Amino acid sequence: MAAGPQAAMEQASSPGLISATEVLVAAATFCLLLLLTQTRRQHAPKGLRSPPGPRGLPMLGNVLELRKDPHLVLTRLSRKYGDVMEVTIGSRPVVVLSGLETIKQALVRQAEDFMGRPDLPSWQYVSNGHSLAFSYECGDAWKARRKLAQNALKTFSIAASPTASSSCLLEEHVSTEASYLVTKFLQLMEEKQSFNPNSYLMVSVANVICAICFGKRYDHDDQELLSVVNMNTEFGDVAAAGNPADFIPLLRYLPNRAMAAFKDVNARFSAFVQKIVQNHYSTFDKEHIRDVTDSLIGHCQEKRTGEDVRVQPSDESIISIVNDLFGAGFDTVTTALSWCMMYAALYPHIQKKIQAELDQTIGRERRPRLSDRGMLPYTEAFILEAFRHSSLLPFTIPHCTTKDTVLNGYYIPKDTCVFINQWQANHDEKIWKDPPSFKPERFLNAAGTELSRTEADKVLIFGLGKRRCIGESIGRWEVFLFLTTILQQLEISLAPGQRVDITPQYGLTMKYKQCECFQMKKRFPSKGSA
């Protein structure tokens, strides 16, 4: 076998292999690209500074540093470089914002400057590039579609329920699913003695959003519903893995399994939604609006004139809006509920306080309602602390500057990608006393009788400003209704002697490791039982 420099030269000059000339051309191209990468960065105008940050490697930037737990790495770096810092991912400069006040300054007070989305290649496959959440568009048409989506979602959540036991449709849907879960969990206890509730939570939460968006509740073993749940899980897994080609342009011209998988799962989900929308079109009756999809179709068919023509939704945008609403109302709620149940099991004394509050305020005869939220401050504080402590959404979807701007004295050029480190803000020792500890009381007044709105508003989970999650209100309501209904009926614990690892696993939403040791038992006999 040939070895050493001489052998290498022989191979380089062999027919069919890379020649010395090609090596020189490749090296020159690399140097040119490196030079372009360095010169493409705009220098700050006189009197301003560019954000500080760690040096990166040529072509790779800081990718290697950020491979594992980027929320923790960026939090550590923020201690050195401050709340406005710059890292490089591939050849792309990225500004990372930390600190609650800095994030509020950017997303709320300078909202127009930071409301853009970066034009990442992979995002064109989300709703065929028409996604409200991922699209780089942020003009009047986008704002009108976003408002339409919010109104439709809210309308079919708080609309009056036909049943006397619920005050609105959301309560009715959640009550149906939560009752199913209570029965299912008790059945699983008889069969297995311990289990993992998360897959059942997923299906129930998916059923709620299906009922609101599509007017349909599925059986829990329905293959269409399970397929949707699996697609959403696939989307989260692929998106969390990231696509290097979004930040390293050269990789776009090479075979890319990650991009292919992302494209495939989005195409399958769009086809699922498109089929349902087409079915709604064929059965649409403007005198009988059944769900969010009907509401959007009705709005689409209204004749618009003048300025309104530009913002009228198309048939294609209806599919993308429903796509977004489903995504906004599914994975975040499921993950938040799974964390709430884990914390309730880990801290039984806290669980008992919640149940005592439920017994005293609601009793055991009727189910919790949204109108009870204001009378259950400790329960609300528990949910907020679960949001803060888990920081299940460590980052928002990346933002982008819409024009040259200045933040905290640092110059940030137009079209700069911006990461919002929500995890850092939720664990900032400057804001929170003893942030690693789980303490719902931090959100209550001194007497423990009222929720502190000031403290509650410090928790970042759904983003801020003009790109704030459109499903935030519905998501918070769902978590409250599911959790209170389950804890009213069941006592949650972990199997004795089992070690549980709740270290968040980094992803689009952060989850703890699979845990098969949940145990549940009924808190009191059913009405009419012995």
Curated annotation (Swiss-Prot):
The topology of this chain with respect to the membrane is: Peripheral membrane protein
CDD domains xref list = CYP1A
One GO cellular component term noted in the UniProt record for this chain: intracellular membrane-bounded organelle
Write the record's keywords in alphabetical order, separated by commas. Endoplasmic reticulum, Heme, Iron, Membrane, Metal-binding, Microsome, Monooxygenase, Oxidoreductase
Q: Which top EC class is given? A: oxidoreductase
Q: Which domain of life is it from?
A: Eukaryota
Please verify whether the record's keywords include Manganese: no
UniProt: heme binding residues: 469
| Reaction(s) catalysed (UniProt annotation) | an organic molecule + reduced [NADPH--hemoprotein reductase] + O2 = an alcohol + oxidized [NADPH--hemoprotein reductase] + H2O + H(+)
Cited InterPro entries? Cyt_P450 (IPR001128), Cyt_P450_CS (IPR017972), Cyt_P450_E_grp-I (IPR002401), Cyt_P450_E_grp-I_CYP1 (IPR008066), Cyt_P450_sf (IPR036396)
Task: Identify the EC number(s).
Answer: 1.14.14.1
For this UniProt entry, what is the primary localization, expressed as one broad class? endoplasmic reticulum
GO terms, molecular function: heme binding; iron ion binding; monooxygenase activity; oxidoreductase activity, acting on paired donors, with incorporation or reduction of molecular oxygen, reduced flavin or flavoprotein as one donor, and incorporation of one atom of oxygen; oxygen binding
**Entry's localization field:** Endoplasmic reticulum membrane; Microsome membrane
The cofactor named in the record is: heme
Name its GO BP terms in alphabetical order.
response to antibiotic; xenobiotic metabolic process
> Per the entry, what induces it?
By 2,3,7,8-tetrachlorodibenzo-p-dioxin (TCDD).
The entry assigns this protein to a family as follows:
Belongs to the cytochrome P450 family.
Q: What does this protein do?
A: Cytochromes P450 are a group of heme-thiolate monooxygenases. In liver microsomes, this enzyme is involved in an NADPH-dependent electron transport pathway. It oxidizes a variety of structurally unrelated compounds, including steroids, fatty acids, and xenobiotics.
> Cross-referenced PANTHER family, in alphabetical order?
CYTOCHROME P450 1A, STEROID 17-ALPHA-HYDROXYLASE/17,20 LYASE
Q: What is this protein called?
A: Cytochrome P450 1A4
